[in-house]
Amino acid sequence: MSNLIPGEIIPEQGEIELNLGKEVKTVTVSNSGDRPVQVGSHYHFFEANKALIFDREITLGMRLDIPAGTAIRFEPGDTTDVKLVSYSGLKNAYGFNSLVNGSLDT
């Protein structure tokens, strides 16, 4: 009989560094809305809720630098700095708020 749990991940000992070698940008974000806004780890930050005020142009092709499956919540009136990393792979974005629907390479 095995003690393995289906789907279990057993990492090696030591620290695991996320997004190793990727360029990181820090962006200041303010929630100008009257409701909290939550943005997930792999959401195309450029297309985040319009109530979030930040320099959108520099966030094209970027996502939050946080573990997969997690999110950051922006409370109304709050201003915070977040770290972003660029997407990998084919660098295509479809859906979200339909602002790109294609290649993220400019």
Swiss-Prot record:
GO process annotations (BP): urea catabolic process
Pfam families (UniProt xref): Urease_beta
Gene Ontology molecular function, alphabetical: urease activity
InterPro entries noted in UniProt: Urease_beta-like (IPR002019), Urease_betasu_sf (IPR036461), Urease_subunit (IPR050069)
Coiled-coil stretches: none
Signal peptide: none
Keywords carried by this UniProt record: Cytoplasm, Hydrolase
Localization terms from the record: Cytoplasm
One GO CC term, this protein: urease complex
Transmembrane segments: none
The reaction(s) this protein catalyses: urea + 2 H2O + H(+) = hydrogencarbonate + 2 NH4(+)
Superkingdom of origin: Bacteria
EC number, as in UniProt: 3.5.1.5
SUPFAM superfamilies: Urease, beta-subunit
Pathway in which the depicted protein is active: Nitrogen metabolism; urea degradation; CO(2) and NH(3) from urea (urease route): step 1/1
Family listed: Belongs to the urease beta subunit family.
HAMAP family noted in UniProt: Urease_beta (MF_01954)
Assembly mode: Heterotrimer of UreA (gamma), UreB (beta) and UreC (alpha) subunits. Three heterotrimers associate to form the active enzyme.
Protein name: Urease subunit beta
Gene for this chain: ureB
